UniProtKB/Swiss-Prot annotation:
Record PANTHER family: PEPTIDE DEFORMYLASE (PTHR10458:SF22)
Family: Belongs to the polypeptide deformylase family.
Function of the protein: Removes the formyl group from the N-terminal Met of newly synthesized proteins. Requires at least a dipeptide for an efficient rate of reaction. N-terminal L-methionine is a prerequisite for activity but the enzyme has broad specificity at other positions.
Upper classification of the organism: Bacteria, Bacillati, Chloroflexota, Dehalococcoidia, Dehalococcoidales
Cofactor note: Binds 1 Fe(2+) ion.
GO MF term set: metal ion binding; peptide deformylase activity
UniProt enzyme class: hydrolase
Catalytic residues identified in the record: 133
Species of provenance: Dehalococcoides mccartyi (strain ATCC BAA-2100 / JCM 16839 / KCTC 5957 / BAV1)
Protein name: Peptide deformylase
Keywords noted in UniProt: Hydrolase, Iron, Metal-binding, Protein biosynthesis
Gene that this sequence comes from: def
TM spans (from-to): none
Catalyzed reaction equations: N-terminal N-formyl-L-methionyl-[peptide] + H2O = N-terminal L-methionyl-[peptide] + formate
Gene3D superfamilies: Peptide deformylase
InterPro entries: Peptide_deformylase, Peptide_deformylase_sf
Length: 167
């Protein structure tokens, strides 16, 4: 396992639509392990493959209750319900966080790291992680949802970003 460099804006890979993972082989398993290690090292809540420079449809995130990493390969959001105001940050946009609207409940499907079909229904922070990380795969960042510059805030040198918004 290795800690990979996290890409930051304006790196082009963050704005590209990622390609489907064609097969789950040893290189994908290594990528998954590296992404989990990178996410944990950066104290992030989630990470998408484009954030480590790999344009593939693969995300990892940590569920707050268990801190275990969840892996979704070729994820697709199939249902969104409700709305809630959230505060959100991103490892690829360091030093900032924004206030935006996300779904209260999100259902996604994809494959786990072993290629088995899975479905995840998340509420609250898990729904937020599913939306945020899956959007990375289409080149969409949370800042694209901000309605005004007033919703984007800079983190001062003595400020610490709350854990729930480190994505």
């Amino acid at each position: 396992m290795a800690i990979r460099r996290i890409c930051e804006l304006p790196e082009p890979v963050l704005r590209k639509k990622a390609k489907k993972v064609p097969s789950i082989d040893g290189s994908i398993q290594t990528l998954i392990d590296d992404m989990i290690e990178t996410m944990n090292s950066a104290d992030g809540a989630g990470l998408a493959a484009p954030q480590v420079g790999v344009s593939l449809r693969l995300v990892v995130f940590r569920e707050p209750d268990t801190k275990e990493a969840t892996v979704l390969i070729n994820p697709e959001i199939i249902k969104k319900e409700g709305q809630r105001q959230v505060t959100e940050g991103c490892l690829s946009i360091p030093g900032y966080f924004g206030e935006l609207t996300r779904a209260e409940t999100v259902t996604a499907k994809g494959l786990d790291r072993h290629g088995k079909a899975c479905r995840i229904k998340g509420t609250g922070i898990v729904a937020q992680l599913l939306e945020h990380e899956t959007e990375h795969l289409d080149g969409i960042l949370y800042i694209d949802h901000l309605e005004s510059e007033d919703q984007l805030h800079e983190i001062g040198p003595d400020d610490e970003m709350p854990e729930e918004i480190r994505e």
